[in-house]
Amino acid sequence: MRFSSCYIPTLKESPADAEVISHKLLLRAGMVRRLTSGLYIYLPLGLRVINKIARTVREEMEKAGFRELLMPMVQPGDLWKETGRWEHYGKELLRFKDRNEREYCLGPTHEEVITDLVRGEVRSYRQLPVRLYQVQTKFRDEIRPRFGLMRGREFMMKDGYSFDATAEGAEESYKIMYDAYMSIFSRLGLRFRAVEADTGSIGGNFSHEFMVLADTGEDTIAFCHDCEYAANVERAEVAWRGSPSTGGCPAMEKIATPGAHSVEELTALLGVPASAIVKTMLFKVDGKTVAVLVRGDREVNDIKLKNLLKAQEVELADAATVQAVTAAPVGFAGPVALDVPVYADAELQGGTDYVVGANAADAHLKHVDLARDAAVTAWADLRAITADDQCPRCGGRMELTRGIEVGHIFMLGLKYSEAMHAVFLDENGKERTMIMGCYGIGVSRVAAAAIEQNHDEHGIVFPPPVAPFECVLLNLDPRSEEVNAKVEEIYALLQGMGIEVLLDDREERPGVKFKDADLLGIPMQLVVGGKGLGRGIVECKDRRTGEKGELSAASLEQDFAAWSEKVRQGWASR
């Protein structure tokens, strides 16, 4: 493709409203343009990136035995009412009515539609498994769309679905998709991790997220250095390997703690470590108030609380609720004689001699033994993991890092098929409910994540499988007949070798072409100018390393083949 005939409106500066680096560079590289809040136009170069990602996804999905279909973006509200998600999904579901007052929504996902399709067709276990997928535009009415393609309202997604007759079959489908996702993200040249994850609004029995590692990632993941355990911090289990206290605990005593609302203020006042303090946090769980206890140097993981109580909504209680329940302002709540259910983090079990709030202003209790002095409803893993924790699987060293979620697979179980009566007859003629899995990849999000992970001060540094072109060919002297003729010869040669090449044939200064070549992030650069041709060479540059070299113009096919393989191997061995 020729630069002069391809619409690539590059920018020298980043637009003021662009926040993250992928958003800035996608705009500067002329790959996308904002239409309105959360909606983007994919320009030719950006669409090439999206299509290359989608092609890799399709190839691996087909290889895994999933078959492509295409479902409508507009979905009838009646299907969502069958599963209860019409009421529970929230304002992110864009609802509307047609001229006949029938309710519809723009699909953020397609579980209801695919289940309706399959329940209308499948009657016997002999027709299972059914494994289907689509690459489709989705819409989620985000309250604050931001970060460009990272969190837009409209986005491109691959969503796949499996229907099985048995739990064993469903687990096989899930494993097939897990392996396919590992292949997809490996082929795309991204550094990533598969992590255990919460099922969120999709629901189901368990799930894995696929995270592109990047310092700018919105999610934090915890992984073990000594085994394969990795999980989103929302899901990460905590292994407490301490020993319960064996010493006796003195009688509980009320003490004055004026103005000590926080753990930091309390430790300074009493001279005790934060680990000797128990925080009592009040939450509203589906409208009912509960208390959660964690050590003073820990944080509550509200997702774990939500899962423990099988709740729909969990939020921190406001100051008015705290005052009403404890008769004290925020900072002085405690578990003793508290008239709401109390859930304590397992790390506290067996421990004694704690400092807790006294449910009275400017007062705390010391020498508290939770088993003796408080009515704990249940003990459970309720705190957020830290880098100081041991691996829950092998006891090894844990590390926390940032990541960008680009894929998510779910073992849905019976969540949708039971609600929508998706049934079949088994080999004994007995009616059974289909067991489902669903599998998503944010295709447009992958493009942004690839840039978040791979960029430098000059622009994008695309991995070869994601880049819009493999090579950019720079004509430094388009007014020279000799240079033009050689450039055309090289252009034809590269195309004949099966190389995707962008020919920069613009009548621009060399400096402009060099800057744009770096900005676009195309992995390989070839530079043709009069001086080089006079020496019989073509200059080359590896965009990732910045390493420059020279290739013989006389044996360019062989030299380019060897050099390009070196560039690809460099990416593979990162």
From Swiss-Prot:
Subcellular localization(s) per the UniProt record: Cytoplasm
GO CC terms, sorted: cytosol
Enzyme class: ligase
Enzyme nomenclature, EC number: 6.1.1.15
GO MF annotation terms: aminoacyl-tRNA deacylase activity; ATP binding; proline-tRNA ligase activity
Entry function: Catalyzes the attachment of proline to tRNA(Pro) in a two-step reaction: proline is first activated by ATP to form Pro-AMP and then transferred to the acceptor end of tRNA(Pro). As ProRS can inadvertently accommodate and process non-cognate amino acids such as alanine and cysteine, to avoid such errors it has two additional distinct editing activities against alanine. One activity is designated as 'pretransfer' editing and involves the tRNA(Pro)-independent hydrolysis of activated Ala-AMP.
Family to which the UniProt record says this protein belongs: Belongs to the class-II aminoacyl-tRNA synthetase family. ProS type 1 subfamily.
Annotated protein name in UniProt: Proline--tRNA ligase
Species this chain originates from: Desulfovibrio desulfuricans (strain ATCC 27774 / DSM 6949 / MB)
